[in-house]
């Protein structure tokens, strides 16, 4: 499960869908499994921190990535606001209504359609690099990140699609998505971990540590490979994969 999490967390294929399917197939889907998923997700987040550490330092005023105008902390805050507000207001409702096999199948298909539409109707990029993203584009991407509150939609799938429609290049949208994910995922995972702390025991440490490390290593490889691949293959192949996954999900889980 650590490998599945690391591979799918930052690809536009829905890590949630893969984790539910994997947990079902191996018979690991109880409350302890849910805490395990939170822990290995933190391993994936650490991979982003390691890969983009210079950029993250620059956001808090330590060091500069470029001499000219560059991505700053306000870009990240603006991108966080829409999903952050909705997540806080409707956290319980989202958990109760959208966390289930049926909604996940629907979101897998809907997310795939969004990606195809974004590729078809996107215009030439005005922001080809991360440092050319405007505040308006950051807010647009943040609005599309709200879709990721629906399990199965995929954070990267929805935000990269939003970036394309806002005239941000594939690579710049993906890099912004990964950086934007750090505070959002740390906050969400931290909250879930605190709420589930009483489920953990010292006997779980070896299992959780193995999953954490595996997710970290695989996520490192997945992020680097995805950024190299994205400029050549675009989002469409991932959209078709989502349709296949939705069919598998429907027949094996529902």
From Swiss-Prot:
GO terms for biological process: cell wall organization; peptidoglycan biosynthetic process; regulation of cell shape; response to antibiotic. It catalyses: di-trans,octa-cis-undecaprenyl diphosphate + H2O = di-trans,octa-cis-undecaprenyl phosphate + phosphate + H(+). It is a multi-pass membrane protein. Disulfide bonds: none annotated. Bacitracin is thought to be involved in the inhibition of peptidoglycan synthesis by sequestering undecaprenyl diphosphate, thereby reducing the pool of lipid carrier available. Catalyzes the dephosphorylation of undecaprenyl diphosphate (UPP). Confers resistance to bacitracin. This is Undecaprenyl-diphosphatase 3. The lineage of its organism: Bacteria, Bacillati, Bacillota, Bacilli, Bacillales.
């Amino acid at each position: 499960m650590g490998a599945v999490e690391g591979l799918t967390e930052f690809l536009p294929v829905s890590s949630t869908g893969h984790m539910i399917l994997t947990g079902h197939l191996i018979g690991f889907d109880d409350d302890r499994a849910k805490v395990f998923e939170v822990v290995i997700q933190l391993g994936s987040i650490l991979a982003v921190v390691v890969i983009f550490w210079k950029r993250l330092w620059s956001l808090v005023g330590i060091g500069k990535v470029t001499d000219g105008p560059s991505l700053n902390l306000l870009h990240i805050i603006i991108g966080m606001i829409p999903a952050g507000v909705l997540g806080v207001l409707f956290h319980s409702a989202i958990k109760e209504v959208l966390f289930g096999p049926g909604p996940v199948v629907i979101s897998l298909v809907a997310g795939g359609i969004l990606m195809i539409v974004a590729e078809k109707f996107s215009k030439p990029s005005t922001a080809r690099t991360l440092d050319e993203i405007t505040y308006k584009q950051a807010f647009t991407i943040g609005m599309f990140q709200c879709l990721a509150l629906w399990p199965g939609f995929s954070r990267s799938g929805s935000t990269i699609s939003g970036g394309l429609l806002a005239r941000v290049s594939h690579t710049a949208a993906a890099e912004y998505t990964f950086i934007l994910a750090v505070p959002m995922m740390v906050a969400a995972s931290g909250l879930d971990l605190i709420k589930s702390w009483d489920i953990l025991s010292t006997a779980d440490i070896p299992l959780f540590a193995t999953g954490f490390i595996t997710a970290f290593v695989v996520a490192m490889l997945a992020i680097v490979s995805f950024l190299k691949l994205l400029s050549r293959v675009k989002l469409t192949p991932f959209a078709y994969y989502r349709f296949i996954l939705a069919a598998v999900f429907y027949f094996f889980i529902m």
